[in-house]
Regions:
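N-terminal low-structure segments adjacent to metalloprotease catalytic domains
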Residues: 1-27, 33
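Juxtacatalytic substrate-recognition/specificity segment
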Residues: 25-158, 162-163
Length: 171
């Protein structure tokens, strides 16, 4: 079902965990402002997006730029492994332990009313408690997506060691 004049990522399914979304470039951030998974509602710039979500996007875009222009890495969506994918979904939710996760396999996109694409997406999860002004979790998890595009090798000493090393530019 297409709803004219509504962003493809504007309205969540009534049973969805996330009640809001914002998209910039290849990133689509899904979040809620209510309940256990809520991000703080502060919106200093008045753009109708919580500052926490804005800050996650800023860090993701900066990391994406850094990985491509300073390290010469090919963006994940340009790798043959992920050519069928059309974006990177970032799900902001509560974590009892840890601060983030990145997934290596493309999956069905988060369903939103008015969505026109059924192409698989890559997924990152960021803890709603993570403050990207103080934490490098978004950049760290995005680097894992870059790693997975290059190699299926997922041994922790390799993936975590490299990702932690690359947190330095964002610290």
């Amino acid at each position: 079902l297409l709803i004219p004049g509504v962003s493809a990522w504007a309205r969540p399914h009534p049973k969805a965990l996330y009640t809001h979304s914002v998209a910039e470039g290849v990133f689509r951030v899904f979040y809620t402002t209510e309940g256990k998974h809520a991000v703080p509602a502060d919106d200093v710039d008045g753009n109708a997006v919580p500052d926490r979500v804005d800050d996650i996007l800023v860090q993701l875009k900066a990391a994406d730029w850094f990985y491509q222009t300073q390290l010469g890495l090919v963006p994940p969506l340009k790798h043959s492994r992920y050519t069928q994918s059309d974006g990177i979904e970032v799900h902001v939710q509560h974590f009892d332990q840890g601060t983030g996760l990145a997934f290596d396999e493309p999956t069905k996109p988060n369903w939103f009313e008015g969505q026109s694409s059924t192409a698989p997406t890559l997924k990152i999860k960021i803890g709603s408690q993570v403050d990207p002004r103080l934490s490098t979790t978004p950049a760290h998890e995005l680097f894992h997506v870059y790693q997975y595009a290059y190699s299926p090798f997922k041994t922790k000493w390799f993936t975590e060691g490299m990702a932690r090393w690359l947190e330095e530019p964002f610290s």
